[in-house]
Amino acid sequence: MVRRLAKTGLACALHWTGANKLIGALNGSRNVPLVLGYHRVVEDYAACARQYMPAMLISRRMLERQLDWIGRHFRLVSLDELGPRLECGAPFHEPVAAITFDDGYRDVYDHALPLLKRKGIPAAAFVVTDLIGTSRLQSYDKLYLLLARAFSAWRAGPRELARLLHGLGIRLPVRGMNDVKQARHLVADPYTAMRVLFTGLPQIELDRVIEALEAEVGIDEGSFQDLHALTWEMVSEMHRAGMTIGSHTRTHALLHHESRDRVLDETANSRQALARRLGTRIQHFAYPDGRFDTAAVSVVADAGYRFAYTTCLHRDPQYPLLTIPRKLLWENSCLDALGRFSSPIMSCQAHGVFDVFARCRQDHWWPVSASVAPGGGPGG
C-alpha cells in the first residue's frame, strides 16, 4: 500500500508540473512513437484473475478507459503507417500511438474488436500460428495451470518442483534453483515458478517439464475455453476489419533459447502461413515475451520481416526497425492507491517515466563465436 501511495503521489506531482513529459523526452520517448501492447481482454477481470494470470488480463471497460485517454493525447495510427514513417525517417509532428495485442487469444475478437470498430481505432494482433483454430493452450498458460494444481496437491510445492526437475536432469540458469533446499525461496508460488521455468528453459526442455507435470496432475486443455486461440475465420475477419495481423512465431518459443534453424522455422514458417491464409504480405513481428538477442534479430531479418517489436527500450543499432520498443499494459497498470483509474499514472506510463527507474533484465548480446546446440541456447 505504501508503494502504491508513493507511486500515486509521484505521478500526480510529475503530471501536474509537466515534468513527466520532460523525463520522457530525456528518456528518448520523443524519438520513438508510443506502441502499447495488451494480451487478453475479458468482461470480468476479478473473476478471471482468480483462475488465470492477472498480468495477462484487462477488462473491456478498463481497456476503453485507457484507449480514451490515449486518444485524447495521441493520434492513434496503424503499424502499417508507423513502420514506414520510421523507416524513411519522416518526423511525427504530433504525438502518435499504436495499439497491439499479443498471442492471438479468442477474447480479443470477442471483446476488443467490437470496441475498436466502434471507436474507429486501428490496431494490430500478433498471433501464434500453430495454435490458431485449435484447443491447445499457450505453453505458459498450460504450465501455470499445471503448477497451480501441483502446488495445491503437493505438501511443499517448491521443494517437490525442484525434485521433479532433478529427476528430469534439468538445470536452470538461476542461482539456487537447482538446490532442493534453496529452491523453495525462489519459487514460492505457481506464477513465480512459471516465470522461472518459462524464461529459463528452451522449448524442448519446457515440454518435458509440462509432460512430467501432466503425468502427476493432468488437465483437460479443451475445458479452458477462455484461453483458446482465435480461429482462422476470426483472424480473417479481423484482417478484413482493418486490423494489422503480424506473427508471434509458430509456437511462442523464446527465440534467444533456440538454435538458428529453430528460430528460422518459428519466424519464416509462421509468416508464410499468415500470408497464405490472408493473401497479404506479412511485415510485422513481435518477439515472444519480448525476448531477443542479436542472433534472433538477425534471423527475424532473414525471415523477411520489415518491423519487429519488443517489450523493453533496448534497440539493436544494426536493426533498429526490428527492435521497436513497446509498453505492455494490463488491468492495474494505471490504477491509483485507491484502485481507481488515474490519468497522471496513465500519463507517466505513456511518457516512459517509470522506465527510468526500471532495469532491463535481459541479455540482448550474443557473441558471434557462441556455440549453439540443436534445440538449445548458446553453448547448451
Please report, for each region that a protein language model flagged, where it lies by residue:
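C-terminal active-site subregion of NodB/CE4 polysaccharide deacetylases
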Residues: 1-100, 107-109, 135-155, 208, ...
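Extended, charge-rich helix/loop segments that form flexible
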Residues: 27-33, 37, 136-241, 372
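Acidic (Asp/Glu)-rich catalytic clusters
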Residues: 71, 115-119, 230-247, 301
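CE4/NodB-like, metal-dependent polysaccharide N-deacetylase domain
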Residues: 92, 105, 113-126, 176-221, ...
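Short beta-alpha junction loops
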Residues: 129-134
